[in-house]
Design a protein with these regions (language model features):
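Residue-level recognition of specific faces of alpha-helices
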Residues: 13, 36, 40-43, 66
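Generic secondary-structure boundary/loop-capping signal
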Residues: 1, 51-55, 61, 86, ...
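Enriched for short, Lys/Arg-rich terminal
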Residues: 72-73, 77-115
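A general secondary-structure boundary signal
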Residues: 30-34, 38, 62, 78-87
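Basic/aromatic recognition patch in beta-strand/loop cores that engages polyanionic ligands
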Residues: 47-83
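Arg/Lys-rich, positively charged N-terminal/basic patches that mediate binding to nucleic acids
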Residues: 1-36
Length: 115
């Protein structure tokens, strides 16, 4: 069975998420959400292909897969010995821009906000 390995970015993001939730909603809520995320990630050991391939969903060249849990996208890669957690992004974050440099802002939004 493969082990889960977190990149430093993913581990930092998980800690920051716990801190932000604790400040906003309290420690108990933060623990519950982080447990939900980490339990779902641990479940990848039983079924590593649970998440769809990013390349099939978004037409980008990538070996990443992702799962969606507790309003967060968790990106991971299947390796020989590990399932590597690359990073996680809240559903409101533009992960396509942050991961792949792909701008997903629709033209009408750009026009409206004059960006």
């Amino acid at each position: 069975m493969k082990k889960i390995k977190y990149t430093p970015d993913a581990a930092d993001k998980l800690r920051a998420l716990k801190s932000a939730i604790s400040q906003e909603y309290g420690e108990d809520k933060a623990k519950k959400i982080i447990k939900s995320i980490t339990d779902t990630i641990k479940g990848l050991c039983d079924y590593e292909e649970k998440g769809p391939k990013v390349s099939k969903m978004f037409d980008v060249v990538s070996d990443y897969r992702y799962i969606f849990v507790s309003r967060n996208y968790v990106f991971y890669r299947i390796e020989d010995k590990y399932i590597r957690i690359i990073n996680l992004y809240h559903e409101k974050e533009d992960f396509m821009w942050q991961l792949f440099g792909i701008d997903t802002t629709p033209q009408d939004t750009i026009d409206y906000w004059d960006e």
